[in-house]
């Protein structure tokens, strides 16, 4: 059974300061408002409605926390880049997000979800740069990969991996599809490492 299928909703917080105690391990998920973040979380956790999907991009302006166990959490950050969100809210959120990435001790990795057809937009790059500056590893998931044929998919993946070298940090890029599960195993391998699951399993085998 997947570790992630045990995810349970804990709380919704209006900003970083309302999160639970800064202890244990957490991994944050971030992405543009139409990048398919909620669908990816639902696929990862094998739960159809753990993270609420919305036809209206930018609807979720709360931070949602999902517990895997007492010490491990998935953090669902609000989608960014949606034009109808007032500028004052955008700026406040960007400041709060920067502080979270740089100061949160329990944060062990950042998953950035990007539509495979439009990766590395300005805010995606800014987010990755913040994470790299804070010595955080980044997993970039090229979502909606099912929308491209195999050849085009591979070309986009190679292009994105080449582009990621410019960040000069621990940035891994994989394909992902919430629809058919493409790339789920690669995603889980990275998360297992961040959460210490891989280490736990090695100890059990010894």
Curated annotation (Swiss-Prot):
Transmembrane segments: none annotated. It holds the Pfam family MMR_HSR1. The keyword Magnesium applies. Residues 23-197 form the EngB-type G domain. GO terms for molecular function: GTP binding; metal ion binding. PROSITE patterns: G_ENGB. Mg(2+) binds at residues 38, 60. The keyword Coiled coil does not apply. Keywords: Cell cycle, Cell division, GTP-binding, Magnesium, Metal-binding, Nucleotide-binding, Septation. Its cofactor is Mg(2+). One of its GO terms (cellular component) is cytosol. GO terms for biological process: division septum assembly. GTP binds at residues 31-38, 58-62, 76-79, 143-146, 176-178. NCBIfam families: GTPase_YsxC (TIGR03598). Belongs to the TRAFAC class TrmE-Era-EngA-EngB-Septin-like GTPase superfamily. EngB GTPase family. Necessary for normal cell division and for the maintenance of normal septation. HAMAP family: GTPase_EngB. This is Probable GTP-binding protein EngB. It comes from Pseudoalteromonas atlantica (strain T6c / ATCC BAA-1087). The lineage of its organism: Bacteria, Pseudomonadati, Pseudomonadota, Gammaproteobacteria, Alteromonadales.
């Amino acid at each position: 059974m997947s570790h992630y299928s045990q995810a349970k909703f804990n709380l919704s917080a209006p900003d970083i300061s309302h999160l639970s105690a800064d202890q244990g391990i957490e991994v944050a998920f971030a992405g543009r408002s139409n990048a398919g973040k909620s669908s990816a979380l639902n696929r990862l956790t094998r739960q159809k409605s753990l993270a609420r999907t919305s036809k209206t991009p930018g609807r979720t302006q709360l931070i949602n926390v999902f517990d895997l166990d007492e010490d491990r959490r998935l953090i669902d950050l609000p989608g960014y880049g949606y034009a109808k969100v007032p500028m004052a809210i955008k700026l406040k959120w960007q400041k709060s997000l920067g502080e979270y990435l740089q100061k949160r001790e329990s944060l062990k990795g950042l998953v950035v979800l990007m539509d495979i057809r439009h990766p590395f937009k300005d805010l995606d790059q800014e987010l990755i740069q913040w994470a790299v500056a804070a010595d955080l590893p980044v997993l970039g998931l090229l979502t909606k990969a099912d929308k491209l044929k195999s050849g085009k998919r591979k070309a986009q993946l190679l292009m994105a991996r080449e582009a990621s070298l410019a960040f000069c940090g621990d940035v891994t890029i994989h394909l992902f599809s919430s629809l058919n599960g493409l790339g789920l195993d690669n995603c889980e391998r990275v998360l297992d490492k961040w959460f210490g699951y891989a280490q736990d399993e090695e100890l059990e085998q010894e």
